[in-house]
Each structure stands twice: as structure tokens, then as C-alpha cells.
């Protein structure tokens, strides 16, 4: 009788390729819509999915309804996604803001993606006034904002971006910011804007032909039939 001994072919730990860590990412959704009923603007639709959430602070009875958006995670990181939809139906009025500044944390590779859709019905009024977005060093943010405004509708929107937390002595030196706006009024494209900063962002912030040392940027947008009459006021700001 012969005896055969089989050699074990177990792989050694040194032969196993390391697996990159997989982090759980979020996909938040927020939908808010206001309508005018019996002469009063009020909430008619709300949908929210973590980490997006909507608060409704108490306001005086004669004031516009107010919604405050927030992310319960305290901010967004690489690979996270948030989709926000805000609408005011015909004749309605509303103010939508955020509870605090939105923080975009450092990414290990993937982009943070944010999609914002604003709709303003005929003869309606929407104030979209979020607090600033703070970009941490090596954050990667891709954001798209679209607005559709029906005839007679008006939109006041602001956007503020801070390249780091200046009060903490922090500054964004590298990463990605790809921010796009598109606004249509009465079916006509009236404003498009795109900002893309990639790679060595510090150099672009310091460039005299770029941001000339600024660490924050802000934009205010007003769309309405009476916009030309407000130009002197805007230029005086």
C-alpha cells in the first residue's frame, strides 16, 4: 500500500491583495412644496429621507411660511448624495433656508453630489436663502442648481461658498468644486453660470486674475419682471 500526502496550498497573508475599505454612503432626499389655499400660503407636500430633514420654525401669522433644511449627519462627505426639490405653486409665497452652514468634508476619492431643483409657479414668490457652504481641504463637491419660473413668478436666490473655516485658520488648498446654475423664466433660458476649480485650488484663490486672495464668494440672483427697476439698488450694494 502506498500513502500519498497532499500538500496544503493555503495562501499566505502576504499573497492576498489588500481590499480598500468600503464606507457606507448616504443618499438624502428632500421635497418641499407650498400652495395658496383660501388666500394663505401653506405646505402641501413634504418628503424627506435621511440625512436630509426639514424644520418649520414658528413665524408670525402675517409672515411668509418658512422651511429650514438640514442634514442630520452634520455634513456631507465624498460619495454622499443629496437631492433637494423646492416648489411654490401659482400665487404662493415661501422662504426656504438652511438651519446651519453646509459642511463638505474631505473626500477619499469620490465626489459629493448635490442636486437642487427650484420651481416657481405663475405669480408666485420664492426666497431661496441657504447659509454658506463650507468646503474643507480636499473636499470634492459637484453641485447643480436649476430653477424653472412661470410667467409672473419671482425668485430671490443667494449662494455663499467658503473655502475652509477661516476662523479656525483652515483653508481649502486642493480638491474639487464644480458648481452649476441654470435658470429658465417663462420657458426661456435667462441665466447660466458654472464654476470649476480642480487640483491646486490654493493657487487659483491666490491668483490676481482669480480670487486675488479671497477665501469666500457670494452670489445674489433676482428673477422677476421688475428686475430692471432694481438695478440701481443692486449696484449700490
Task: Please identify what each model-predicted range represents.
Residues 136-144, 149-174:
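Acidic (Asp/Glu-rich), glycine- and aromatic
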Residues 161-237:
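A structural signal for small-residue-enriched, beta-sheet-centric alpha/beta enzyme cores
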Residues 101, 119-120, 150-152, 166, ...:
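Short, intrinsically disordered/low-complexity patches at protein termini
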Residues 99-104, 132-134, 160-163, 195-200:
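Short, solvent-exposed aromatic-acidic interface loops
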Residues 27-31, 81-83, 113-115, 142-144, ...:
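Broad gene-expression machinery/nucleic-acid interaction feature
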Residues 89, 121, 148-150, 158, ...:
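Feature marks extracellular polysaccharide-active and adherence modules
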Residues 2-132, 137, 144:
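N-terminal, charged/glycine-rich beta-strand/loop interface patches
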Amino acid at each position: 500500500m502506498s500513502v500519498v500526502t497532499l500538500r496544503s496550498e493555503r495562501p499566505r497573508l502576504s499573497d492576498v491583495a489588500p481590499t480598500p475599505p468600503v464606507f457606507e454612503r448616504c443618499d438624502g432626499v428632500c421635497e418641499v412644496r407650498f400652495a395658496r389655499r383660501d388666500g394663505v400660503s401653506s405646505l402641501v407636500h413634504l418628503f424627506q429621507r435621511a440625512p436630509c430633514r426639514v424644520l418649520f420654525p414658528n413665524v408670525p401669522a402675517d409672515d411668509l411660511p418658512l422651511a429650514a433644511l438640514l442634514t442630520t449627519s452634520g455634513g456631507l462627505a465624498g460619495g454622499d448624495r443629496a437631492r433637494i426639490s423646492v416648489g411654490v405653486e401659482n400665487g404662493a409665497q415661501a422662504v426656504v433656508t438652511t438651519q446651519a452652514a453646509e459642511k463638505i468634508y474631505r473626500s477619499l476619492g469620490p465626489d459629493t453630489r448635490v442636486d437642487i431643483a427650484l420651481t416657481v409657479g405663475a405669480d408666485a414668490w420664492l426666497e431661496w436663502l441657504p447659509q454658506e457652504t463650507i468646503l474643507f481641504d480636499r473636499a470634492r463637491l459637484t453641485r447643480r442648481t436649476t430653477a424653472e419660473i412661470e410667467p409672473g413668478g419671482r425668485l430671490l436666490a443667494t449662494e455663499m461658498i467658503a473655502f475652509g473655516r477661516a476662523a479656525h485658520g483652515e483653508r481649502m488648498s486642493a480638491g474639487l468644486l464644480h458648481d452649476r446654475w441654470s435658470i429658465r423664466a417663462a420657458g426661456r433660458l435667462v441665466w447660466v453660470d458654472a464654476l470649476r476649480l480642480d487640483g491646486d485650488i490654493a493657487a487659483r484663490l491666490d491668483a490676481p486674475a482669480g480670487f486675488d486672495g479671497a477665501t469666500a464668494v457670494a452670489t445674489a440672483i433676482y428673477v422677476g419682471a421688475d428686475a430692471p427697476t432694481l438695478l440701481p439698488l443692486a449696484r449700490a450694494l
